[in-house]
Amino acid sequence: MNPERSERIEIPVLPLRDVVVYPHMVIPLFVGREKSIRCLEAAMDHDKKIMLVAQKEASTDEPGVNDLFTVGTVASILQMLKLPDGTVKVLVEGLQRARISALSDNGEHFSAKAEYLESPTIDEREQEVLVRTAISQFEGYIKLNKKIPPEVLTSLNSIDDPARLADTIAAHMPLKLADKQSVLEMSDVNERLEYLMAMMESEIDLLQVEKRIRNRVKKQMEKSQREYYLNEQMKAIQKELGEMDDAPDENEALKRKIDAAKMPKEAKEKAEAELQKLKMMSPMSAEATVVRGYIDWMVQVPWNARSKVKKDLRQAQEILDTDHYGLERVKDRILEYLAVQSRVNKIKGPILCLVGPPGVGKTSLGQSIAKATGRKYVRMALGGVRDEAEIRGHRRTYIGSMPGKLIQKMAKVGVKNPLFLLDEIDKMSSDMRGDPASALLEVLDPEQNVAFSDHYLEVDYDLSDVMFVATSNSMNIPAPLLDRMEVIRLSGYTEDEKLNIAKRHLLPKQIERNALKKGELTVDDSAIIGIIRYYTREAGVRGLEREISKLCRKAVKQLLLDKSLKHIEINGDNLHDYLGVQRFDYGRADNENRVGQVTGLAWTEVGGDLLTIETACVPGKGKLTYTGSLGEVMQESIQAALTVVRARAEKLGINPDFYEKRDIHVHVPEGATPKDGPSAGIAMCTALVSCLTGNPVRADVAMTGEITLRGQVLPIGGLKEKLLAAHRGGIKTVLIPFENKRDLKENPDNAKADQDRHPVKNNEEEQTLSLQNYPSVFLFFFFFFFEAIEAFNRFTAAGLKIACPAAILSLN
């Protein structure tokens, strides 16, 4: 029976290579040919409908009218995304089969006049039998073909439309292009199901043959492995019988190594006892290999070897100052240690923990400390470590056991007193294999690490001469472990510090790394400051280094393309030519003063950050809503701030009954990021006052502090990081709790000079400085009048209503 035909359509045509799209099929396509991209753009400009037609030959790059099949699928474009390499990723959904009656090429893209193909009338009873058989056969095919997930069968059972069922089965079959096209051209559903069942029967036969071959190969491999094992056993027996005379030479060599290692008495006795066991064993036995490996580790570990520690304070200070700009507290602590060491023969190595955001130089500082003290440097990355055996090692009862990473690193460095960097100590975790943080308690305790016990060595090892330096991004470290370390906080760099670091270290390093010659590139201070302000917003300097590296790469490309160019100078005026548009604003969190929007300050594990808080008031019944992934403490801060506003409503010029007639919504943007803590209390209070009075908040002011029900502002933590975040953002006025005034001494001098910091005791002081116009009693009468107008309008029939200009809301 010929299929019924519906109305004609005119539609853009997209040629496909090796792909046939069926109706109801959602598939992503990557389009690279210019004509095809123009076809997609034409479809997007019209009704997002496009006809997908397969090419007869996939190798044809520029297909003509005769290179396409005549039957395709009309599809809807769900999503279109242009990729950086010029190609386009498009997500399409097949809608209905269609046959091309006339295909034309207008130079821009293919266009066709086509007509939809409708399914003919069929015998429903016969179709029901075919559907059941097809599903059953497809289930058997899935059991043999492990590449198709079982969930496909579940979704197949939920499909009621036989045509859609047939197309879904066809989409999951590994058919050739011609077979896929044949299925597409079959408008008769029964014919399509019969064709697919025949294809499935053929595929099932092939898969069964493949399974039998795979089983035969597996048996053959097992036989080969057994023969190999027996041959190796035979070789071992022959070698044991014929080469027993060579064993004493190896034992003598191990004896000499034990004597030369200068082990403590306990360790030497253990090593010699193991050597005696080895002499009694067959050299080729598995146990002999384990014992030999143990003795090798015992003689590799440095029991007595030390590197000479430098005691010249002046030289050490020069090294630290040369390698790192700023970080005075850490440098002072190292110099104190060296000063004491110059007077005391035996001093336990300090255990320092450098805590700070990424990119401030914690890891590189460990290398500089090793260089300044004359110690060898060894680093152990603890990020992701979750097995206690990584620290303590495995017992020798396990196959393939080894010492822990700690002893392995000590054996590798070869001395007893290195600088040992424990990197990312806060990134450790635990599971059923133990807690590595608990294993480190013994390592980092100066009173206990003189006798550190490794499960593999089974003897005590002295770690008291090791200088341990740990690094961490946060204080999220178990309390007992934190108590054993001397914590030194590293805050983010100021703009002046970043400028000096870039000039001294980052720029010369990237010029050398990108093979630029002397005099070929000049980057002045204005360009570096522009990068810091408008292209990075970070506590450290990693992003700054990446941007400088980008400048160097573009300079190299420019020099190679233009041979006449000998020198490139980058300044603040032409910086955007190399780095593109500015990514960040500098000077304020927003461009203008806004009602109900406040800039707060937040502390994160990677340093401080600006936190925008938004409020909105709408007519309602007193419902309070807060969004933005806020924690319990932050939600309670909002409730406390609202109570403060209600208690002072008349004084602030707010109708005391506002809570009964207004719904309030508090939102903190970046809702995917969890936020918590009480330090946004005064910011919440100010946002509510601004929203209820219509008084804008100054965009150049940021604030932090906890609010009480009495309106008092309580002290907060992380002040230095928050002030540096405001400094990075160009905020000139910062409001802080009065009791945090003492913490201002720890802030860098240049940051102090660029910021106006106001310690405040209560919300009235804070709102006087932050609101564009401080609320007055006049506003109370205005809002009372405004509420009366609203009440009158609600009860007035359709007709004349009293208007209240919104502009009056900002009057004081």
Swiss-Prot record:
Compositional bias (Basic and acidic residues): 745-764
Catalyses which reaction(s): Hydrolysis of proteins in presence of ATP
Region (Disordered): 745-766
Record-given protein name: Lon protease
Enzyme type, top EC level: hydrolase
Start and end residues of each Lon N-terminal domain: 11-204
UniProt KW Cytoplasm keyword: yes
Domain of life: Bacteria
EC code: 3.4.21.53
Induction: By accumulation of abnormal proteins, such as at high temperatures. Under stress conditions.
Assigned protein family: Belongs to the peptidase S16 family.
GO molecular function: ATP binding; ATP hydrolysis activity; ATP-dependent peptidase activity; sequence-specific DNA binding; serine-type endopeptidase activity
